[in-house]
Amino acid sequence: MSSFLGKWKLSESHNFDAVMSKLGVSWATRQIGNTVTPTVTFTMDGDKMTMLTESTFKNLSCTFKFGEEFDEKTSDGRNVKSVVEKNSESKLTQTQVDPKNTTVIVREVDGDTMKTTVTVGDVTAIRNYKRLS
């Protein structure tokens, strides 16, 4: 998992507004979500990974073991059941389930770029991050 460890900054985002809309996120919150450029930091402590997301809008942190369900609060305030699977050393798949939607987030690292593909139903967004450290 060393390919994920460190700090990443959002560099480009495509179709994220449509994903937020599909999730029922309010117009005002979507406007904020479309303008912030979050930083995501991944750390490991034994068999637990922590993902810290920081932005001018909100800071969120979740700690998990691969393959084990955990409770997560999303940046738009939803409470979800989440599972992160380690597909390979450079690919993680996270599934978030709430009463209305299932969101699948695939994170893939290639060198100093992390491609994040977010899918809700038939709507997909791609958010690319650049490694800061």
UniProtKB/Swiss-Prot annotation:
Keywords: Cytoplasm, Lipid-binding, Transport. The keyword Transport applies. GO terms for molecular function: lipid binding. (5Z,8Z,11Z,14Z)-eicosatetraenoate binds at R107, R127, N128, Y129. Pfam families: Lipocalin. InterPro entries: Calycin, Fatty_acid-bd, ILBP, Lipocln_cytosolic_FA-bd_dom. PROSITE patterns: FABP. (9Z)-octadecenoate binds at R107, R127, N128, Y129. It comes from the Eukaryota. GO terms for cellular component: cytoplasm. Belongs to the calycin superfamily. Fatty-acid binding protein (FABP) family. May play a role in the transport of fatty acids. Binds various fatty acids, such as arachidonic, oleic, palmitic and linolenic acid (in vitro). Forms a beta-barrel structure that accommodates hydrophobic ligands in its interior. This is 14 kDa fatty acid-binding protein. It comes from Schistosoma mansoni.
